[in-house]
Design a protein with these regions (language model features):
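Terminal intrinsically disordered/low-complexity segments used for targeting and assembly
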Residues: 91-102
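Amphipathic alpha-helical coiled-coil segments
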Residues: 1-75, 82-93
Length: 102
């Protein structure tokens, strides 16, 4: 019947919106973790540069730490992009006119 079909579609929409909300929440968590990783990698690179200046490290190790810090920053940017995309999908799926600027 028409009511059953409508209820099924409503349930499917609800499941999809809930899934998008979960993705957005997980994306927020990923950004926080990536930011922590970036901060730690930056600290490690700075510490290695100080060790190098004191003669306790070599250029290769400094370079590896700096490369790790750069990679962490890229992962953070990717996480921020994914968070923005997840939020945009959620806003579009819920037809949040205020968020869409309509």
């Amino acid at each position: 019947s028409l009511r059953l079909r409508r209820r099924t579609i409503e349930d499917q929409i609800l499941v999809e919106v809930n899934g998008l909300a979960i993705q957005a929440t997980n994306a927020d968590r990923l950004v926080a973790l990536a930011a922590d990783e970036t901060a730690l990698a930056d600290r490690m690179a700075e510490a290695e540069r100080r060790r190098f200046q004191l003669g306790a490290s070599d250029f290769i190790v400094v370079n590896l730490r700096e490369e790790s810090a750069a990679d962490a920053r890229l992962r953070e940017l990717d996480a921020e992009y994914r968070r923005s995309a997840a939020r945009a999908e959620l806003v579009a799926a819920t037809a949040d006119r205020e968020q869409l600027g309509l």
